[in-house]
Amino acid sequence: KKLWEADEASTNASLMNLAIYSEDPDSLLRNSDAIQELTREHACRAILIGMDRGASETRIQAWITAHCHLAHGKKSVCCEQVSFLLQGKVIGRLRNTIFAHLASDLPLVFWWQGELSDLFEAALYRMIDCFVFDSTEWDDPRAGFAKIEEAVEARERIVVQDLAWTRSHHFRMAVAGLFDDLVAQRALGEVDSLRVVAHSGQRTTALLMVAWLATQAGWRPGLELDIAAERAAGCDECFMLESREGRSITVKGEWDDAGAALGLVELHAPDCLVRVSREGDASYLQQRLECPGHELMLRGPADEISSADLVADQLSRSGRNGLFRK
């Protein structure tokens, strides 16, 4: 408080509490850099927590930092950051540390990095208004999503934001944009294959993209899933879906570690091709529609690459993310 009173050129600004938690004790410096970028557009009170659960000695270390940015070339707007390194036994210390340093009248956005450990419990998530995570970081996504579902049931108004879902935002918009075309709409019921290419570390991102397409198109798991999947060749991961019309749809997942997180979404019908692609870290997506006597080629924005930029995008869009929760 005295810091802000002594500096007439700076204003302390906060629109939310933003906590970043990691069980990597070396994460504090990296996450401080992320806060520096996030506060350019999102004023907040930042709480960084690094946890070293394997330490033999139980102790807490804390640091206070201010991230300042010039507002219209005049007064600088500053956001306060409190960083904690918790070592050793952590029973009750995580939530108590957060509780004690929240701006009580502001919502809490909590970004959990890495696996959901036993510290993700009701006493913690009942404090949270928006929970940000990245399911591509989990070894067991099924178990992780079960914990998320439990949290949503216990606290209905919590907003959950998976960066694996955010990472495909512009891909989804690009595919939807191509299907605004009447020719593509007529071909949707005849789609017989879907090909998705992604980085091997982004399997969940790819599967969420497939799930979105299936939900929007009304596809369901095929009745002969296992047998049909064995017949589908030339892919790293294959399975079958069935359209509303009863048509079998082969889904082919391929991993390209030299490419983008999500590099290609391609739908085939007998006479039509709908394709959205991204080359490496290009800042744009290429959209293509090919049907007899009708061709369309467009470009659109691509999704951000870094996790911090994805979080910034998600904070800008806000909303309850109802489609993801389906």
Predicted regions and their residues:
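Conserved, well-structured core segments that form the ligand-binding/active-site neighborhood
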Residues: 82-84, 88-185
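Structural alpha-beta junctions
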Residues: 36-48, 102-109, 126-131, 153-154, ...
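ATP/pyrophosphate-binding catalytic subdomain of soluble kinases
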Residues: 164-230
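Acidic, Ser/Thr-rich peripheral helices and adjacent loops at domain boundaries
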Residues: 62-73, 129-138, 150-156, 231-233, ...
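C-terminal structured domains
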Residues: 2-8, 12-17, 25, 33-35, ...
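An N-terminal, globular interaction/scaffold subdomain
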Residues: 1-111, 118
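A generic structural motif
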Residues: 45-54, 110-114, 135-138, 159-162, ...
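Short N-terminal or domain-adjacent regulatory/targeting segments
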Residues: 1-14, 63-65, 165-184, 326
